[in-house]
């Protein structure tokens, strides 16, 4: 059967939302799956909680992220899960088309019963990982280009992880202003040890693994209501507002972080034209082309006085120009950035399953 992933709709790998605790009921004989907390004064049941990572039995039943916390006194319930809750339809991700299916799978797994229609009406989201999988092999050349095309290297921290992944974080302390974009090789990630129990659980592991061949995942993490409203351009985080929010969120975030080579004329001449250019290039190589590390090293060595910010800025502009020139000559950075932008703009793709 062939299913279509509508990329014009928002898709999420992880969601967390609040709803009424009246929307949950336990399944007879499965009450032990939940942790029960009693009110110390009244002796009445106050809180029930399910955490798929709490113990070995829960992990065997649900080998992926699922968290349910219902407070009977405050009448509030928090539910968080990953798109693996879609089971065989995992590649479809969480969207307006699959959200109800994910909720119903909680009962299918024998955990509890949920009033899914009521949840749709009253839920509000406070955590989302906006996600898109694109047909692109995440090569070393692409990773190097992304490192060097960070428009404002002071604004975003980046780090490589798992060999074929890169994470960009906005360098701020305020939680509502924090931004995190992860780009990684999904074909490699789906085969890691943490995903093996999930693949054993579903009936179509071969199809799921085949779907992610030569796929790169782009994932924007949003951890507060204010951030969600800002990025999705919505007035609140109710169900329909979120699911029908800004469909270009990942493209816009990509454009916020990455720019084409800022000094294209520099690549039209020889890269090294003297000893000064040579020392700049050696400095870049020593620090693996991490501009932020270079700037911090200059500060640590006190090469410029506290009143010489302009001089430091001029020096860093020379370093940055050399980095962009090298990047364009060696990787054709502009075409790589534009190719990624086009893929993030693509409308739909087919899923064989």
Q: What function would you assign to each model-found segment?
A:
Residues 1-300, 328-353:
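Structured, helix-rich domain cores that form ligand/interaction pockets
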């Amino acid at each position: 059967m062939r299913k279509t992933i509508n990329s014009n709709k928002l898709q999420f790998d992880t969601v967390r939302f609040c709803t009424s605790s009246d929307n949950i009921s336990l399944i007879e004989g499965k009450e032990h799956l939940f942790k029960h907390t009693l009110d110390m004064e009244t002796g009445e049941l106050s809180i029930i909680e399910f955490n798929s990572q709490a113990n070995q039995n829960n992990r065997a039943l649900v080998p992926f992220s699922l968290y349910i916390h219902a407070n009977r006194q405050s009448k509030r319930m928090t539910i968080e899960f990953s798109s693996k809750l879609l089971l065989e339809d995992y590649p479809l991700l969480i969207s307006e088309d699959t959200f109800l299916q994910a909720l119903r799978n909680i009962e299918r797994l024998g955990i509890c019963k949920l009033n899914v229609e009521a949840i749709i009406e009253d839920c509000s989201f406070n955590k989302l990982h906006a996600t898109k999988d694109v047909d692109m092999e995440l090569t070393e050349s692409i990773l190097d280009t992304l490192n060097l095309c960070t428009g404002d290297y002071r604004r975003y921290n980046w780090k490589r992880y798992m060999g074929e992944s890169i994470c960009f974080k906005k360098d701020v302390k305020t939680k509502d202003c924090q931004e995190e974009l992860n780009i990684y090789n999904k074909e490699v990630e789906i085969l890691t040890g943490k995903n093996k129990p999930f693949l054993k659980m579903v009936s179509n592991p071969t199809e799921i693994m085949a779907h992610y061949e030569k796929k790169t995942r782009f994932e924007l993490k949003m951890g507060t209501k204010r951030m969600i409203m800002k990025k999705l351009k919505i007035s609140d985080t109710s169900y329909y507002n979120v699911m029908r929010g800004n469909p270009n969120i990942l493209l816009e975030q990509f454009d916020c972080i990455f720019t084409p080579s800022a000094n294209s004329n520099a690549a039209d001449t020889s890269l090294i034209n003297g000893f000064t250019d040579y020392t700049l290039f050696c400095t870049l190589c020593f620090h693996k082309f991490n501009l932020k590390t270079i700037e911090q090293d200059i500060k640590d060595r006190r090469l410029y006085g506290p009143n010489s910010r302009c001089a430091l800025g001029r020096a860093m502009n020379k370093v940055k120009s050399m980095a962009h020139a090298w990047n364009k000559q060696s990787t054709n950075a502009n075409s790589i950035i534009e190719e990624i932008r086009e893929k993030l703009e693509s409308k739909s793709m087919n899923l064989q399953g």
